[in-house]
A protein has these predicted regions:
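A structural signal for multi-pass alpha-helical bundles of membrane permease subunits
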Residues: 30-45, 83, 132-144, 167, ...
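Short membrane-interfacial helix/loop motifs at transmembrane-helix boundaries
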Residues: 2-3, 31-73, 227-231, 278, ...
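Loop-to-helix entry region at the N-terminal start of transmembrane alpha-helices
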Residues: 76-86, 141-164, 205-206, 210
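Interhelical loop and adjacent transmembrane-helix boundary motif
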Residues: 8-15, 45, 57-69, 218-276
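Transmembrane alpha-helices
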Residues: 20-21, 28-33, 165-171, 175-177, ...
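C-terminal transmembrane helix and the adjacent membrane-cytosol boundary/short C-terminal tail
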Residues: 2-10, 15-20, 169-180, 184, ...
Length: 285
């Protein structure tokens, strides 16, 4: 009995320690986001100073004008937002297409070649951003390519594509390997088989890769900083860096961050719910 109670106590404390560690990690990860969200509902220009609940910053962000202080919101913020959306969507679309085709090609390789290419695909993901940024900067200089919007998009495609490959590969491994050949035997062209047979199976992985590419593109600073050139192009990450160097952050960034986070959160929830429904329907069949 004594040994049994000791084992139970050890089990309790080990579970308690594991849960406490998990909650600590969650607090460290999400407390800053929660703080930004909370202080997006106050007009104070000093972060952390609560001056009362208001939607004023959201109104400023949407209208581009601060009616209380009678000043215009920094127009560079909206230019940075526009370039961020252009870069993120362009890079995500191209990365999703290239990553999906690359994943299909890797899947059809021999086992040894597949392992080699998969290992090479993982290198850009573990490579420090600053190293990737400097490497691409030197490449563009060597090739004589003027840095600007196009080079930023190319750079983002380079580091986003491996993540799409990683998102699509599990769907390929779970898929019946004979359905593509069966479609060809039934008279479908390779393009028809790809579009009507493979794509529906890979769609969840492609969507996950697309959303991941968008978030990675929005989040990136190092690669963008070295590939944007000096023609005034700014994304949100480089705008925030330049804004912080001036001595503070534009208050309208708080509601902007909150809206971006909520949008991505809702998209992820929708995708997870849809994936769970599909898995349940497959199990019932």
């Amino acid at each position: 009995m004594k040994n049994g109670s000791m084992v139970e106590r050890r089990g309790f404390w080990s579970r308690f320690a594991g849960q406490a560690y998990l909650w600590l990690i969650l607090v460290v990860l999400y407390a800053p986001i929660l703080l930004i969200f909370v202080f997006s509902f106050t007009k104070s220009k000093v972060f952390g100073n609560w001056t009362g609940f208001t939607f004023g910053l959201y109104e400023n962000l949407l209208t581009g004008y601060d009616y209380v202080d009678q000043v215009q919101v920094d127009p560079n913020l909206y230019r940075a937002m526009l370039y961020t959306v252009i870069v993120a969507l362009s890079a995500a679309v191209m990365s999703t297409l290239l990553g999906t085709l690359a994943a299909i090609g890797i899947y059809n390789m021999r086992q040894r070649d597949r392992r080699i290419i998969t290992f090479m695909n993982s290198i850009p993901m573990i490579n420090p951003d600053i190293l990737t940024g400097i490497s691409l900067f030197l490449l563009f200089v060597f090739l004589g390519i003027s840095r600007g919007l196009a080079t930023v998009i190319i750079a983002h495609v380079v580091f986003c594509t491996p993540y799409v490959v990683l998102s699509v590969m599990p769907r390929l491994t779970k898929m019946n390997p004979n359905i593509y050949e069966a479609a060809l035997d039934l008279g479908a062209t390779p393009l028809q088989a790809l579009r009507k047979v493979l794509m529906p199976e890979l769609w969840p992985g492609m969507i996950s890769g697309f959303i991941l590419s968008v978030t990675l593109s929005i989040d990136d600073f190092g690669v963008t900083f070295f590939t944007k050139g000096s023609n005034g192009l700014e994304t949100l990450s480089t705008f925030i860096y330049a804004d912080a160097r001036k001595g503070g952050l534009t208050p309208e960034l708080r509601p902007l961050f909150s809206l971006i986070f909520l949008t991505i959160l809702v998209l992820l929830l929708i995708i997870n719910l849809r994936t769970n429904k599909q898995q349940k329907s497959i199990k019932k069949k």
